[in-house]
Amino acid sequence: RANLPEGIEFVEGDICEQSLIDELVAANDTVIHFAAESHNDNSLRDPSAFVHSNLVGTFALLEAVRKSDKRLHHISTDEVFGDLELGGTDAFTETTPYNPSSPYSATKAGSDHLVRAWVRSFGVRATISNCSNNYGPYQHIEKFIPRQITNILTGQPAKLYGTGAQVRDWIHVDDHNDAVLAILERGCIGETYNIGASSPGSGDAHVTNKQVIETICELMGGEYVHVADRPGHDQRYTMDATKLRRELGWAPK
């Protein structure tokens, strides 16, 4: 909170508290819905928290923007599409069928569909984006990269699930935010946009989990150990952001 820029008000509350959400939404022009439980490991231990925040919370927010007629952008994930085979060249597009494989991705898929239903049924002015894996400053310690860095800083080995062959399509948080701003300013109501840093057809933002950990260990002088793989671990994510690049003129920096 100490790093918040001037003019930003931090309000701590429950995304499912309808009266609070109504009040906050009514006092603003635009809502960007980042709020979510988002760590897969946690969703395997306690799915109920994900149903509460990701589904009930999105419902509460949709009702608030419906009552106040505010513009909404809903942040989602590439994980709603499931995963792709290792070694392939195919990619997720905006028309890829949903095939979530974890409680987290299932609740995010459900929240996407709620937004689409409120757009069609109630005329809510909303857009959706599905983004690949983020990295950057101040990321929560539960996430893959800061978790490994923190382990090494505290004298523990970094931990790699299984063989580490899983592939992720990484994007810096600043590029993600720039894409969201482009959608808010130039996107079409009711549309969905994929966000990813790989150039179309190249996979140049692809890195295996093992490569990420080896790079961290090399830079920090640490070591890593293999641990049992996560149940249902997705193998590869590849995002095709052609629509976002072509229609809105966005590109990662």
Feature-to-residue mapping (PLM):
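N-terminal Rossmann/SDR dinucleotide-binding element
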Residues: R1-T30, A241
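C-terminal substrate-binding subdomain of Rossmann-fold SDR/epimerase-dehydratase oxidoreductases
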Residues: G13-D14, I152-K253
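NAD(P)-cofactor binding segment of oxidoreductase domains
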Residues: A26-V31, R45-L72
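Short alpha-helical oligomerization interface
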Residues: N40-G57, F92-P100
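Conserved Rossmann-fold NAD(P)-dependent oxidoreductase catalytic core, especially the SDR/UDP-sugar
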Residues: F59-P103
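Conserved beta-loop-beta element that borders a ligand/cofactor-binding pocket
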Residues: T77, D112-P137
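Flexible, glycine-rich beta-alpha linker
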Residues: F81-G82, N99-P103, T127-F144, G201-S202
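Active-site helix of classical SDR
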Residues: P103, T107-G110
